[in-house]
Amino acid sequence: QNGIEFVMYPRDYIIENVGPAINSEWDDFAPVVTADERFMAFTTRRQDGNTNENVFDDNLYYEDVFYSEKVGDKWSVARRIGEPINIPYHDSNLAISADGKQLYLYKSENGGDIFLSERNPNGTWTNPVPLNQNINSTYSENSVSISPDGNTLYFSSNRPITPGKTDLDIYVSKKDSKGQWGPAKNMGPVINTEYDEDGPFIDYDGKTLYFSSKGHKGMGGYDIFKS
């Protein structure tokens, strides 16, 4: 019923393919872009340039993080971001800070945790380190977004808020006076439903939160919402 309603009242949006400098014949996904739109990191399962020449159990190449920089108004040919971010196994980017100096990554350790790598002045990246236990739990944390001022973190987790309830919800954490991430708070029923909410992205206006949901009124499955 919802799908019929949305089809009857379409919105005008233009979707453009960013082209062969970024996209390959393999899966390319999860792009994150700096506020000035000059730097992009994304995850790919392409063969060319992959850290691991072997394939995973699904017969696809391992996830690797690649990046591209804008030259004029065009994206440069994407390149592997390199060690220590790229490893012989799955590595995937989740978010980038507005200034492009911090890259948040997902690793499958401990059920799925969020890691942080910082960009050095020479363009290399530091060893990814896990965020503190207020963010990472024994459950899965698999998406994250950082506010433009770097002081608020939005992330998804399937940690149970009631016994037996392990759907994905979106949480928020703020930095304390020591620069550490404080206790995570569930964003409540305005954002979260009894189904999965995932993929939060706080816009660079610092006010608009985009996320995907299976529970809010949509076409079915995951749809994109904003609040």
Q: Model-flagged regions — what are they?
A:
Residues 1-227:
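Short, conserved micro-motifs composed of acidic
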